[in-house]
Every structure is written in C-alpha cells, then in structure tokens.
Amino acid sequence: GDKYRXIXGRXNNVDXEKTXAQLPPXFPIKIPPNDXRI
C-alpha cells in the first residue's frame, strides 16, 4: 500500500492503484514500463 500511496500521492492506496493505472507519472512501481514480461 505504501508504494501506491507514495507514487500516486493518495491516502487511499486502493484509489491510488486505480488512479496510477490511468494517470502518469503516478503508476504502479511494481510493474515497470520497460518490463519484458508485459
């Protein structure tokens, strides 16, 4: 939860996860944009 809260700047890590998936640069750090697996 701290990753999403820190990256997305949201108190609610669930909301941060949803927002980060759509609004850069706040994106889920556990899924790098250069990840060859995705």
UniProtKB/Swiss-Prot annotation:
**One GO BP annotation of this record:** hydrogen peroxide catabolic process
Q: What is its main location?
A: cytoplasm
Query: Molecular function (GO) terms listed?
Result: lactoperoxidase activity; metal ion binding
Catalytic activity reads:
2 a phenolic donor + H2O2 = 2 a phenolic radical donor + 2 H2O
Q: Does the keyword Ion transport apply?
A: no
Which Enzyme Commission numbers does its entry carry?
A: 1.11.1.7
Name where it's found.
Answer: Cytoplasmic granule
Q: How is the cofactor bound?
A: Binds 1 Ca(2+) ion per heterodimer. Binds 1 heme b (iron(II)-protoporphyrin IX) group covalently per heterodimer.
Q: Does the UniProt entry include the keyword Metal-binding?
A: yes
Q: Which UniProt keywords apply?
A: Heme, Hydrogen peroxide, Iron, Metal-binding, Oxidoreductase, Peroxidase
Give the protein's cofactors: Ca(2+); heme b
What role does it play? Mediates tyrosine nitration of secondary granule proteins in mature resting eosinophils.
- Quaternary structure? Tetramer of two light chains and two heavy chains.
Its family? Belongs to the peroxidase family. XPO subfamily.
Q: Can you say what this protein is called?
A: Eosinophil peroxidase
Organism the protein comes from: Sus scrofa (Pig)
